[in-house]
Amino acid sequence: MLRHLLVFSLIALLAGCAGLTSREALEGQGNPAQWQIHKQQISQLDGWQINGKIGIRAPQDSGSATLFWLQRQDYYDIRLSGPLGGGAARLTGRPGDILLEVSNRGRFKAESPEALLREQLRLDLPVSNLLWWIRGLPAPDSRSRLTLDADSHLARLEQDGWQVEYQRYVEQNGYALPERLKLYGQDLEVTLVIKDWQPRQLGQ
């Protein structure tokens, strides 16, 4: 009986470790198994609507704007309005087909959102990774270092030269989602405050 119990315990332990991909280095006070459950639940969210604010601090320029973000699986519609970006800007598209519309300046197309924002708004933002970070998840295509809080949610994330601090979560429709987070890049600090989360599972 004891032998069987030990075997089952070992299997459960190995299964829990298998859920941690080799790309993730995990630390902190949270429970790795609970993190995997949370990660799997949040990963199923492939649609959302967000209303909030974004603030950016850089050596030569700073500003803030209201943020609207509509996500429908791989399609996104991100809108900024306010001093940041010189008025209003709208970023829409899906991987490989991105459109940026800037008030009083026109429409611009590119294959990556990062290139468009860098060229037209002088913003060096990792939009492709933000699709994951905004949900409190690491992007799956590169290595990351994760620090868990006592609730087994992300407290800190290091990935692709960026550091993300998750300062507050909110419970919305049964999902624990980031409400306030700060991103630190090279000579850039970004603050995101989400005032309204509307998560969706569209693939069901």
Curated annotation (Swiss-Prot):
Q: Which InterPro entries match?
A: LolA/LolB/LppX, OM_lipoprot_LolB
Q: How does it sit in the membrane?
A: Lipid-anchor
Q: Where is the lipid attached (N-palmitoyl cysteine)?
A: C17
Localisation per UniProt entry: Cell outer membrane
Keyword Lipid biosynthesis present in the record's keywords: the answer is no
Main subcellular location: membrane
Q: Name one GO cellular component term.
A: cell outer membrane
- Keywords in alphabetical order: Cell outer membrane, Chaperone, Lipoprotein, Membrane, Palmitate, Protein transport, Signal, Transport
Which SUPFAM superfamilies does the annotation name?
Answer: Prokaryotic lipoproteins and lipoprotein localization factors
Record PROSITE patterns: PROKAR_LIPOPROTEIN
CDD domains documented for this protein:
LolB (cd16326)
Q: Does the keyword Transport apply?
A: yes
Residues linked to a lipid group, S-diacylglycerol cysteine type: C17
**Per UniProt, what is one Pfam family of this protein?**
LolB
| Signal peptide start-end | 1-16
What does the record list as GO biological process?
lipoprotein localization to outer membrane; protein transport
Q: How does it assemble?
A: Monomer.
- What biological function has been recorded for the protein in this entry? Plays a critical role in the incorporation of lipoproteins in the outer membrane after they are released by the LolA protein.
NCBIfam families linked to this entry: lolB
Q: Tell me which family the UniProt entry assigns to this protein.
A: Belongs to the LolB family.
Name used for this protein in its record: Outer-membrane lipoprotein LolB
Organismal lineage: Bacteria, Pseudomonadati, Pseudomonadota, Gammaproteobacteria, Pseudomonadales
